Amino acid sequence: MKEIVYYDFDLDLNPEIRWVKIFDAFKDKITELKSHLVNLLKPHDSSLKVISMLSGFINPENILHYGEIKYITSKLGMKMYEIIILQLVYEITAACTSAVIDVGDNKLFLRTLDWPLEFLKDFTIGLNIIRANKKIGQTITWIGYVGFLTAWNHKHNYTIAINYRNSNESNQSRLAKIIKNIQRTITLKWPVGYMVRYLIENEKPIEKVIAFTTEVQLISPCYITVYISDGQSFVVTRDCHKTVDIRTDNLIQTNCDFGKNKPNILYSVERRDYVESVIASITTDISPDKLIKTLLKFPVVNEDTIFWVCQFEGKTYSNIV
């Protein structure tokens, strides 16, 4: 395993220069990153042709984080609509495990992030979210992606983690999903990673987090785990247009709905069952290190796992697998 390196991400800087130091740190690997991203886009050539004809799609007024995407586009030598579609592709390829586990009087938060994209391990980074010279939150992400899928807020002590969900609405080809996501983006629905970023960087209190995660229109169905170290954690099951379920117990979430065994994406059922078995074996004298090591075994950590993060008693532990 490899330690995750954190970089300062200053929101007070012009959006077009926020990523400069981070890209500079990876200057010797940018060509490699571009090659991987181009290969990732190849199966979506049809989507790219459609997007290239949608002039309004790259209108700065329609694009959140336009300045950042503009800079990333220039550094990678790619077209802007290619970078934009990458933001959407990531939302329909991630399989993850998130869990909130009672350990005595405390809670442990577990998160693994799984993608069938081995190259992401070399480009996974942490960001210290800075505003007014103060660290207001953190996220684990990768170069080229401007949303947050795993992030935590310091002021209000909560963490948000997103898991991919394959709802009835999303039982269609990947091309159809992407085109649908493009349509929703143009009509200003929220990419879920952008929604999480909005909550974290604007230091929204938990009441706003509950409202946003349950009420806003999203471009993709998902599961949203909100871990509150000193309060009531919860998991929201979302379709694009509505909340399907919200629960405050049994907080183990993989990539199938609570109480169901299908779709069994990347050992979703086995991951859930394994975490349940670990919870059942917890003793009052178990150490955090031992518990984390026990949790981070197959199938929770598997061939597609990119990184993991655990939070316990105010400390955050994380590594690239």
From Swiss-Prot:
Supply one GO molecular-function term. Answer: fatty acid amide hydrolase activity
GO biological process terms, alphabetically, are: fatty acid metabolic process
Q: What protein am I looking at?
A: Uncharacterized protein R632
Q: Name one Pfam family in it.
A: NAAA-beta
**Coiled-coil residues:** none
